[in-house]
Each structure stands twice: as C-alpha cells, then as structure tokens.
C-alpha cells in the first residue's frame, strides 16, 4: 500500500494538466517528460511534429498518435501546445505524447527523434500563392532546422511548410552550414499532389481511388506539379481534353480548397492525411520493409536541377534510391520544361535566403 504522501504526489501529477501554465515560455507540469511513463510505450519510433497546434499539425498529431509504428510523439509549437497535448494524450493508443511550448523547449522536443515532421508556418489565404508565404515561413523553417541540426542530426526530416520548392533548399543550406547535411534524410512532402491525382483520375475513370496510382513529379506549386498520366496504374488512356482537365485540376487543387473555404483556411485535413501517409512510409522504410516507393521533393540528379520531385525508394537510411522518370509523352515533356524554369527560380530563392 502506498502511503498518503505518495498517493498525494501521484494525484498531483495526474491533475496537473488541468492548470494552465503560468507563462507560455515556462515549462508547465504537463510538458515535463518526467510525467510520461515512457517505459510503457509501444515499441517503435520517436516522432516530433513541429507546428503541432496549427491547422495541419493538429489532425496530423491525431493520425500519428494512431500509427502503431510510433512509440513516442513529441508535439511542439509556440502556442496552444498544452491543450493539444492533453487532448491527444487521452487516446488509448500506444504512443506516449509529450508537449513542448515555445522556443526554449525546442531542443527538448527534438532530442533523440527518429523522424521530424515540419508543418509549421502560416497558411495560404485567398489570392495568396505559396511564394507569398516565403518571407514568413522561410524564417520559421530556418530556425527549426537549426534545432534539428543540433539535437537530432540523424533524424529523417519531412518538410511540409510552403513553399516546399524553396523551404527544402533552405533546410539543406542550414544543415550544410551546421555540417550535418545528409540528402538522403531530407524530404519535401508532395504526397498531397499524388493523393489528389489518384482521386481525380479515379473520378474520371470510375474507379476506386485506392486502386489508382499516379506518379507526380517536378515540385509542389502550380505548374511545377506535373502528373504523369501516361504512367497511371492501372494502365489506361485519356483524351486530350481529359489530360488537360486533370493536369490543371491537380495543379490547382490547393487553390480550389482555399477558395472553397473562403478565407477560413487552406487544405489542412487532406494535407494532414497525405503527410501521415508519407510519414508512415518513412517509418516502414526505417523498420526495413522492402518496396516502399513514394514521390518526394529531394536532392536529385534526375534533371539538371539540384532538387526535384520524383519517385524514391525509402529504407533504413531514408532515401535508398531515386528512380528514373520513365518515358514521358510530348505533353509531359513540354510540361517538364515549363516546370523546370519555375523550379529553378524557387530553389535559388531558398538557397539565397540562407546565404544572403
């Protein structure tokens, strides 16, 4: 039997989340890792979400808490993390959840992580392009990647923050300056383009979208998003009108959601789904599963550009192989040239941000 003092201490710990922290910049009882019984966690990987209180971060945290490959889930943001952490932590799944609030706790959030996912930043609003977000999100990604370089340099890093065509090069430059850059471990998340392509193609063909796979190459904004409709699985053919319609809709999928939400947000739910799907693929690769192939925006030599989105095979070290683009038809070759021109500018913009 435990004595009265021990029982009181235990009840104090259990009730600590009911009191808000005295300051957002001070560690609250909820945020202390010592209050989590880590030894009871399921076997698996340690994952951190940076920007966990945002529109993408919250549903992404929910989905990662449900992933059986996750043993420890760290949620970091500059606001509202205690509430999100308390909410998510009540789910009876295996992952132990810990919350971290504000810049002083970034290092604790990152230490020992196997996978770091970055959805942090401001969302798109009507009339905004992804590049309009650059000046704000570029600085956020730089700060977070400096923390990663210091605290978990061997982690796999999934970059969601837009514009991905620039933020991935920013992350690479930060890691280079820190001496920790490993191109195999830095991946820009373009999975939402693939998810949309699968959905829209399935609608046109009258198929189940779960049975459709459309490679999407290039980048993650506008004309840099190039679906390879000639390589759809299962094999099928499209009219020129269908090709034009599908390509345009896939490229403008993000804008479609922003306009439909009429100022109330961007594609947060579908992005969280896509991000969790890609993160799961990375974790299965880390586990050693064979045949894990996803599209991602990575350091690449498949074109003359230093970064490019294409199919990659994932494994224990992150990217194990970057697959060739395969045969492209005339429409796709023309689209590729248009995409490369815009991509080159976006990549250089990211590099210049760090080296200015």
UniProtKB/Swiss-Prot annotation:
Location within or outside the cell: Glyoxysome
Reactions the enzyme catalyzes: (S)-malate + NAD(+) = oxaloacetate + NADH + H(+)
PANTHER family documented for this protein: MALATE AND LACTATE DEHYDROGENASE, MALATE DEHYDROGENASE 1, PEROXISOMAL
Membrane-spanning segments: none
GO molecular function: L-malate dehydrogenase (NAD+) activity
Binding site for NAD(+): 51-57, 77, 137, 160-162, 271
UniProt name for this protein: Malate dehydrogenase, glyoxysomal
Keywords per UniProt: Glyoxylate bypass, Glyoxysome, NAD, Oxidoreductase, Peroxisome, Transit peptide, Tricarboxylic acid cycle
Pfam families: Ldh_1_C, Ldh_1_N
List of catalytic residues: 220
Primary localisation category: other
Assembly description: Homodimer.
Domain of life from the UniProt record: Eukaryota
Gene3D superfamilies: Lactate dehydrogenase/glycoside hydrolase, family 4, C-terminal, NAD(P)-binding Rossmann-like Domain
Coiled coil: none
Species annotation: Oryza sativa subsp. japonica
Sequence similarity: Belongs to the LDH/MDH superfamily. MDH type 1 family.
GO (cellular component) term, any one: glyoxysome
SUPFAM superfamilies tied to this protein: LDH C-terminal domain-like, NAD(P)-binding Rossmann-fold domains
Entry's EC annotation: 1.1.1.37
């Amino acid at each position: 039997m435990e004595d009265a003092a021990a029982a009181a201490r235990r009840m104090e710990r259990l009730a600590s989340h009911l009191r808000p922290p005295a300051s957002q910049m001070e560690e609250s009882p909820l945020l202390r890792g010592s209050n989590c019984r880590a030894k009871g966690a399921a076997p698996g990987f340690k994952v951190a979400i940076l920007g966990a209180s945002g529109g993408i971060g919250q549903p992404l945290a929910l989905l990662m808490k449900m992933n059986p490959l996750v043993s420890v889930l760290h949620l970091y943001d500059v606001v509202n993390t205690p509430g999100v952490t308390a909410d998510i932590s009540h789910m009876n799944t295996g992952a132990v959840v810990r919350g971290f609030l504000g810049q002083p706790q970034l290092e604790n959030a990152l230490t020992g992580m196997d996978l770091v996912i970055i959805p942090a930043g401001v969302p798109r609003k009507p009339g905004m392009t992804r590049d309009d977000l650059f000046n704000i999100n570029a600085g956020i990604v730089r700060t977070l990647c400096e923390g990663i370089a210091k605290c978990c340099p061997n982690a796999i890093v999934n970059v969601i923050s837009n514009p991905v065509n620039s933020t991935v090069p920013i992350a690479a430059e930060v890691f280079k300056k820190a001496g920790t850059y490993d191109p195999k471990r830095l991946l820009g998340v373009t999975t939402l383009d693939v998810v949309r392509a699968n959905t829209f193609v399935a609608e046109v063909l009258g198929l189940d979208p779960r049975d459709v796979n459309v490679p999407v190459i290039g980048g993650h904004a506008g004309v840099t998003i190039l679906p390879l409709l000639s390589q759809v699985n299962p094999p099928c053919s499209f009219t020129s009108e269908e090709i034009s319609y599908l390509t345009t809709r896939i490229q403008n999928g993000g804008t479609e959601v922003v306009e439909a939400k009429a100022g109330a947000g961007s594609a947060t739910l579908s992005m969280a789904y896509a991000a969790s799907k890609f993160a799961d693929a990375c974790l299965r690769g880390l586990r050693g599963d064979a045949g894990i192939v996803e599209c991602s925006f990575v350091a690449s030599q498949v074109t003359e550009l230093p970064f490019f989105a294409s199919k990659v095979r994932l494994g224990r070290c992150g990217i194990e192989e970057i697959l060739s683009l395969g045969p492209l038809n005339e429409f796709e070759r023309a689209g590729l040239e248009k995409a490369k021109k815009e991509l080159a500018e976006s990549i250089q913009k990211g590099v210049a941000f760090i080296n200015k």
